[in-house]
Amino acid sequence: MTGSNMSECLADAMCQRCQARFAPTERIVNSNGELYHEHCFVCAQCFRPFPEGLFYEFEGRKYCEHDFQMLFAPCCGFCGEFVIGRVIKAMNANWHPGCFRCELCDVELADLGFVKNAGRHLCRPCHNREKAKGLGKFICQRCHLAIDEQPLMFKNDPYHPDHFSCSNCGKELTSDARELKGELYCLPCHDKMGIPICGACRRPIEGRVVNALGKQWHVEHFVCAKCEKPFLGHRHYEKKGLAYCETHYNQLFGDVCYNCSHVIEGDVVSALSKAWCVNCFSCSTCNMKLTLKNKFVEFDMKPVCKRCYERFPLELKKRLKKLSDLSSRKAQPKSVDVNSL
């Protein structure tokens, strides 16, 4: 299509939302063949632009992620949060794939299948073990015969010990064998290999050990990523796999006000999982200043005072009540039960 033909087509085109035509020089949003004015391409619920252009469509209307969750998404039977994307339906509930796990070994069940066992959802190995316990014996997962003596547990499964040899010395194993990085060792060999290695200098740690960031450290080698001073037992703060002292953590990652987007100087109001300047924390409807002592409800990720909340439609209050109940499970500071308003 030539430039002149395209101009003629756009001259006759109309915005999908307001049905008005487009100015010759204005920017046009094309969403799956539908054309919009830039200011018309907004969430059908909160009328705000879609963050990073991400939206969810339901019955011909487009919603931002937050409003789609609040209006339509099912709630996970484990974590209580909204499920977006793949939903696992099992045990008369909805689940995130990562939340539907064996109740004994915690392995994900979404792609493995599960077995109901006494009202629990279990993976097949755990189900088999529970069934064997009912018989009073373990079942060897290699030869599938009953284990009369103490079993050797390897990767959470029981075995006859004489099925295995030590990965280091080659001796036949007994039930007191130990697993290390997927290999089995007799107890003497394992004890020789169990010395922790420092995450900084990569040398063995023979004295006190600091466990942090998923590694082990010499006390003097566990330091602030900025000033490199040892913490020596003092509090540290973690960010993207690095540890910082309090001073440099605040300098590098200070709280930013959700309302004005400025770094907060002075007191910080922590509410609704966000940080606010004291002067910016107010009712999003009537602009009345709020404190954490006031009763308020979260709506569109902002606080709404008690007086404005009471004017909301009944159906909206029901949705907010459900959202409040889910939030209270996470023990968020100053969350308000809408039943008390």
Curated annotation (Swiss-Prot):
Tissue expression as described in the entry: Detected in heart, lung, kidney, liver, urinary bladder, fat, skin, skeletal muscle, uterus, large intestine and testis.
Localization of this protein: Cell junction, Focal adhesion; Cell membrane
Membrane disposition: Peripheral membrane protein
One record GO biological process: negative regulation of cholangiocyte proliferation
Cysteine disulfide partners in this protein: none
LIM zinc-binding domain location: 13-74, 76-133, 138-195, 196-255, 256-315
One Gene Ontology CC term in the entry: plasma membrane
Keyword Phosphoprotein: yes
GO molecular function (one): metal ion binding
Gene3D superfamilies to which the protein is assigned, alphabetical: Cysteine Rich Protein
Membrane-spanning parts: none
Residues with Phosphoserine modification: S328
Record has Transmembrane helix as a keyword: no
Keywords: Cell junction, Cell membrane, LIM domain, Membrane, Metal-binding, Phosphoprotein, Repeat, Zinc
Quaternary data: Interacts with integrin-linked protein kinase 1 (ILK) via the first LIM domain, and in competition with LIMS1. Part of the heterotrimeric IPP complex composed of integrin-linked kinase (ILK), LIMS1 or LIMS2, and PARVA. Interacts with TGFB1I1.
Function as written in the Swiss-Prot or TrEMBL entry: Adapter protein in a cytoplasmic complex linking beta-integrins to the actin cytoskeleton, bridges the complex to cell surface receptor tyrosine kinases and growth factor receptors.
PANTHER family given in the database record: LIM AND SENESCENT CELL ANTIGEN-LIKE-CONTAINING DOMAIN PROTEIN 2, LIM DOMAIN-CONTAINING PROTEIN
Protein name per UniProt: LIM and senescent cell antigen-like-containing domain protein 2
Organism whose genome encodes this protein: Mus musculus
Source lineage: Eukaryota, Metazoa, Chordata, Craniata, Vertebrata
Gene from which this protein is expressed: Lims2
